[in-house]
């Protein structure tokens, strides 16, 4: 049992980050059977990004801190999810019947829709990172919360989506266990809640009630993002695939940061 858990954890790290991990036969099967492992990897990733972002925030002007923070996000998590967002954008922008949209999404070349979605992703990340970097709020908690929320959106898509076609997405969907999904969401909310409460009680972190409200709304945002993506994907592609799951990661990260940033900056 412990061996299978370790195998799954290795695959989760390799799948969700760029950290060098040696994969052996059976690791991805172990990960697919234990998809709650999305969350511990997300929390560790968020911790690393939070430390890096806060360090940049302490020693650099806000624009430079924001650029380096965004760079670290993709250096640590890779661009597989960004590529999924690009393919998702190509499929949505393509006009015509569902079959044409699916072909556009599966095309290996990035089209106008994909380039637009990637550009908007980077612009939103930069703007939101700069919003926090230039404020009294430390980047640590928003980055940690955003990574946890991104993975909650992904596993929600996997748990409740139907496969559009055979591939990595259908493989993960077929092996998702609802009890593992529930455990993952609860685990993510506990970890995020601890981080938010910590941020609220630290002196100089801003209005505690506003911090808690921002964090609470951010915790709910990946469920809303996943629901919207599921509806859009079903209408346009007849279901979800790996690209849709990857797109959910990028969109939910931005949504969580956006919700937190908006609430913390409200003048009331």
UniProtKB/Swiss-Prot annotation:
Enzyme class: transferase
Membrane topology: Multi-pass membrane protein
Pfam families, per database record: CobS
Location (main, coarse): membrane
One GO CC term on file: plasma membrane
EC number: 2.7.8.26
Cofactor(s) this protein cannot do without: Mg(2+)
Listed pathway(s): Cofactor biosynthesis; adenosylcobalamin biosynthesis; adenosylcobalamin from cob(II)yrinate a,c-diamide: step 7/7
UniProt-recorded name of the protein: Adenosylcobinamide-GDP ribazoletransferase
UniProt organism field: Methanocella arvoryzae (strain DSM 22066 / NBRC 105507 / MRE50)
